[in-house]
Swiss-Prot record:
Similarity remark: Belongs to the arsA ATPase family.
Higher taxonomy: Eukaryota, Amoebozoa, Evosea, Archamoebae, Mastigamoebida
GO BP annotation list: tail-anchored membrane protein insertion into ER membrane
Subcellular location: Cytoplasm; Endoplasmic reticulum
Positions with a binding annotation for ATP: K26, G27, G28, V29, G30, K31, T32, T33, E238, N265
Chain residues that bind Zn(2+): C274, C277
One Pfam family here: ArsA_ATPase
Function description: ATPase required for the post-translational delivery of tail-anchored (TA) proteins to the endoplasmic reticulum. Recognizes and selectively binds the transmembrane domain of TA proteins in the cytosol. This complex then targets to the endoplasmic reticulum by membrane-bound receptors, where the tail-anchored protein is released for insertion. This process is regulated by ATP binding and hydrolysis. ATP binding drives the homodimer towards the closed dimer state, facilitating recognition of newly synthesized TA membrane proteins. ATP hydrolysis is required for insertion.
SUBUNIT field: Homodimer.
Disulfide bonds, paired cysteine numbers: none
MF (Gene Ontology): ATP binding; ATP hydrolysis activity; metal ion binding
Record's protein name: ATPase ASNA1 homolog
Amino acid sequence: MSLSPPNNLEHIITSQTLKWVFVGGKGGVGKTTTSCSLGVLIANRNPQKKVLIISTDPAHNTSDAFDIKFGAEPKAVPGVPNLSVMEVDVKDAMKGMFDGVEQGTNQNGEFGLLSEITGMVGMFKSVPGIDEAIAFSKIINQAQQMNYDLVLFDTAPTGHTLRFLSLPSVLRDMLEKVIKLQELFGPMMSQFGGIIGTNINFNELKPKMEDMLKTSEQIVKDFTNPNLTTFIPVLIPEFLPLYETERLIQELMNLNMDVNSIIVNQILPVNDCCDYCKNKRSVQAKYLGQIDVLYSDFHLIKINMQTNEVRGVPALCAFSKNFEAKH
């Protein structure tokens, strides 16, 4: 019988190949505390590395976790010079991309072209998660240009940021439509922006989408390479978080994304004398047993409920000891 993996994240902390680490889970399970404390730990243990934490969760709790106000540009964390944090709004990243197309008027009677373009854009925007997918492409490009050695993502609740892996296939479909439109309407494409009252140059749409496709294909290649990327689910020992975590892990595996570590957070101590806590701990024990069986091949890190708020660099440093090997 094979031994279970160590109950720590040393393989991530000491990795010389990892470039991207995702931390995700149901809201309220402690994923932001996990991502921030892990970022502090990796930066402190690897002073030669430039580490960046990117929050893509609309709640942006990273500012609260560090007790520092962060924004859309990377900001260094005082006391941890090789760690920076930024908070990205995916809605801002998508803003204006297709503005005006669906609302375009048809004053010159170009019903055929208007219908084709509006239908194409409408279909493109209706793809679930397409805004996050394109925003991720922009975010990844930005992070790559900054030359960080490791990027940790504090993601939106369970699964929301995984849809970007479908972006290449969506873009390929859209490119086929753009090519078809150019073949059908030819020179009219360059005049269409004036017809519907928008500044979009549809002759530039094809090369832009080709560039986006090339970028997204490389991102997917990197994100499905276990030497470069891993995903860490965070949960608490209750039914819904466990159910959603199992669904998330199955989705990750179907997308060929590596997941080998799980954080089980907010565990109540066994010897708590409060009746409510005893009953709560009894429920937790049931799900902890299921977690042990389901994820015996994973690095399982179990963390007790914290008696104090985890806020600020010193508190994050203290919390991060849960991820290290015990000596």
